[in-house]
Amino acid sequence: MKYTSYFLAFQLCVILGSSGSYCQAPFFKEIQNLKEYFNASNPDVAGGGPLFLEILENWKDESDKKIIQSQIVSFYFKLFENLKGNQIIQRSMDIIKQDMFQKFLNGSSEKLDDFKKLIQIPVDDLQIQRKAISELIRVMKDLSPRSNLRKRRRSQNLFRGQRASK
């Protein structure tokens, strides 16, 4: 488990490396602390290939990539929550979580609260399963890009009709 966690911390560094994160000494230092703690220099860490990097490379469209990134960020939040209380790496995890919060959720505490709420929903609870199935139709409608397109067309037609009548 230690090697896997270290490898994940290393991948986090790579994922968040865009936008000059590598140049920021405090963030880079905290990633280095996690690397040392999880012994990332061991060759068996790379066994089986990367966890997230190949998946991220497969998704080119920015909006699609956000979906994958949300799952990856969710994973790291769960990982950090699992390691919570480990005083040796707690400061490093807090700094990295704060940076993720700024980058992924644009610093919005409401979005962070909703994100945390979603990742903490237990999937093995029967009542939760029943609620999720009950809401599935509305969720699917919300996911459908066609419904947004119809709304847009409808409002465009209304606007055009108002202009034509004048």
Curated annotation (Swiss-Prot):
GO biological process: one example: positive regulation of protein import into nucleus
Main location: secreted
Annotated Gene3D superfamilies: 1.20.1250.10
Tissue expression summary: Released primarily from activated T lymphocytes.
Recorded superkingdom: Eukaryota
Location in the cell: Secreted
Residues with PTM Pyrrolidone carboxylic acid: Q24
UniProt keyword annotations, A-Z: Antiviral defense, Cytokine, Glycoprotein, Growth regulation, Pyrrolidone carboxylic acid, Secreted, Signal
Record's signal peptide: 1-23
GO MF term (any one): type II interferon receptor binding
Glycosylation site list: N39, N106
Cellular component GO terms, alphabetical: extracellular space
Membership in a protein family: Belongs to the type II (or gamma) interferon family.
Function: Type II interferon produced by immune cells such as T-cells and NK cells that plays crucial roles in antimicrobial, antiviral, and antitumor responses by activating effector immune cells and enhancing antigen presentation. Primarily signals through the JAK-STAT pathway after interaction with its receptor IFNGR1 to affect gene regulation. Upon IFNG binding, IFNGR1 intracellular domain opens out to allow association of downstream signaling components JAK2, JAK1 and STAT1, leading to STAT1 activation, nuclear translocation and transcription of IFNG-regulated genes.
Complex formation: Homodimer. Interacts with IFNGR1 (via extracellular domain); this interaction promotes IFNGR1 dimerization.
Protein name as it appears in the record: Interferon gamma
Organism: Tursiops truncatus
Gene name per UniProt: IFNG
